[in-house]
Amino acid sequence: MQARYRTDYAGEFVILETRWTGGRKTQTREWVSNPIENHHISGRAACIGSAFDADRFNHVRLQRHRGGLLGSKKLQTYGVGDIASTMRLDFAVETRVSQLATLKESGYTEKNIVYTTARQCLAHPGEFYLLPHSPGLLDIAVLPYLAAFDGHQEIFMLGYNRETAVENATWSQQVRNVVDAYPGVKFYFVGEPSNMYEAWLEPANTQAMTYREFIGYCDV
């Protein structure tokens, strides 16, 4: 996986139609400009992959997080669609058709950013935002990719552990691939350290952190 950054991203072409004529393929493409300029003070983000640890830490608290003096510790929040159903996120990621419909019908997309695939953006013009560079990752792994893409230097991973319910078993390796692609970014896996995948904690740019430590460190 290659590290990419929003500062270098002007936009990308999206394929609208593909045709085969006389054995030759032709495509109709449309340029989609980058619609987001993400300005953040602290360089910190929280990626909420699931509500698994909600009994230990109510992630909804982050919706009101101010980050201490002058917002120096404020966290931008990234979360999957299920989390977006419970709180306002700075950036949500959802690719499931059923959950996208739920977010749209609830009015969530009117005032909030929801990233999804090019196919779903074309199917629902003006409702969703295009995932930059189509990373080909599961939603839960897209979160840290986007946070690093946006230039955050410290990323706190909440709801990521061995018991996180994800249908595709490759998800933990995808998370590791993101970590490896951004060696200059510090990834904190928040929760019970013994419940984390060992492969996540092998790189020098990762660290396990309890919720008590997270609350103190981020002034939550």
Which residues fall in each region the model found?
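Metal-ion/cofactor- or nucleotide/acyl-coenzyme-handling active-site neighborhoods
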Residues: 1-220
